[in-house]
From Swiss-Prot:
GO terms, molecular function: acyl-[acyl-carrier-protein]-UDP-N-acetylglucosamine O-acyltransferase activity
Pathway connected to this protein: Glycolipid biosynthesis; lipid IV(A) biosynthesis; lipid IV(A) from (3R)-3-hydroxytetradecanoyl-[acyl-carrier-protein] and UDP-N-acetyl-alpha-D-glucosamine: step 1/6
Protein name: Acyl-[acyl-carrier-protein]--UDP-N-acetylglucosamine O-acyltransferase
Gene name of the record: lpxA
KW Lipid metabolism (keyword) present: yes
Species: Blochmanniella pennsylvanica (strain BPEN)
Compartments where located: Cytoplasm
SUPFAM superfamilies: Trimeric LpxA-like enzymes
């Protein structure tokens, strides 16, 4: 179904069954598969391939040579019915690739809202990306990576499969991430190690002075004391009773399966 207000260049191929909502603009030489749905006011520049079971929300901008919903690169994949879901207001720049999920994951690769994926970013199968994230040129995510809200990842950075990147994290360029990065932290290097807190980012996003001080205290517990992760978790729970923002650390440590960067 193609809405009558959609604008589609005659050189583009829209397979029967695709759903194109109102005021979508599809430029030249695009291919849209039969199981694709594109939300209102989304713009496809040119030379874009969208395949598989792919749901794209409203007001996204997708640039030339992007490939969305293609078969993943997991050798176990056997043409199972898996998909990708993309939210609203995302900018997906040139040559970005986002692959469909696997049955070994949750059958879905999921992108939130208001993200910027710069040129040549690769998001592998079963990744879950939150909202308001920025991935600079040539960032590569392995399968099953989770990136929480308001995270910034510098160019040429590679993240190992199954890693979790916490909210408000900033990762410097050319880093190699092989373990989980707790919230609010600046990380850099190969292998990535912590370099303090993303204080400037927290201030820009309106965190109160008391919350920032509490986050500093949490960082000291986790990285400047001799505590094990388990004993640090208990100390953080006590701090969270007075400062609920510290529950971000506690919940993250509960989720972490690969261990945290040290």
């Amino acid at each position: 179904m193609i809405h009558q207000s959609a604008i589609i260049h005659p050189s583009s191929i829209i397979e029967e069954g695709a759903i194109i909502h109102d005021n979508v603009h599809i430029g030249p030489f695009c291919f849209i598969g039969a199981q694709v749905e594109i939300g209102a006011r989304t713009l496809l520049k040119s030379h874009i391939v969208i395949n598989g079971i792919t749901q794209i929300g409203e007001d996204n901008q997708i640039y030339q040579f992007a490939s969305l919903g293609e078969v993943n690169q997991d050798l176990k994949y056997a043409k199972e019915s898996t998909r990708i879901e993309i939210g609203h207001y995302n900018q997906i720049r040139e040559s970005v690739t986002i692959h469909r999920g696997t049955i070994q994951g949750k059958k879905v690769t999921k992108i939130g809202n208001s993200n910027l994926f710069m040129i040549n970013v690769h998001i592998a199968h079963d990744c879950i990306i939150g909202d308001h994230c920025v991935m600079a040129n040539n960032v590569t995510l392995g399968g099953h990576v989770r990136v929480d809200n308001h995270t910034i990842i510098g160019g040429m950075t590679a993240i190992h499969q199954f890693c979790i990147i916490g909210t408000h994290v900033m990762i410097g360029g050319c880093s190699g991430v092989v373990q989980d990065i707790p919230p609010f932290i600046i990380a850099q290097g190969n292998h990535a190690t912590p370099f303090g807190l993303n204080i400037e980012g927290l201030k820009r996003r309106g965190f109160s002075r008391s919350s920032v001080h509490a986050i500093r205290d949490a960082y000291k517990i986790l990285y400047r004391s001799s505590k094990t992760v388990e004993s640090a978790k208990e100390a953080l729970k006590a701090l969270a009773a007075e400062h609920p923002i510290i529950n971000e650390f506690v919940d993250f440590l509960i989720r972490s399966q690969r261990g945290i960067i040290r």
